[in-house]
Amino acid sequence: MSKLPVIAGRECVKALGRVGFAVRRQQGSHIVLRRGSPFAQVVVPDHRTLDRGTLRAILRHAGLSVDEFTKLL
């Protein structure tokens, strides 16, 4: 398994957009993204750098592996 990259929240949102996620809304520093089929909803904090555990949880909710995600960056 690859190491998780150190990225910002906005970079994560752009990468998830490439696999069909769309920004649903934003409240404060949290961006809610949603994909229709298969249904998935993730919340990405708009921070300068995402913690490894936070990024891993986002990927788990999105149904992506670390390798798949790094190819999207």
Residues covered by each model-derived region:
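Basic nucleic-acid-binding interfaces
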Residues: 1-73
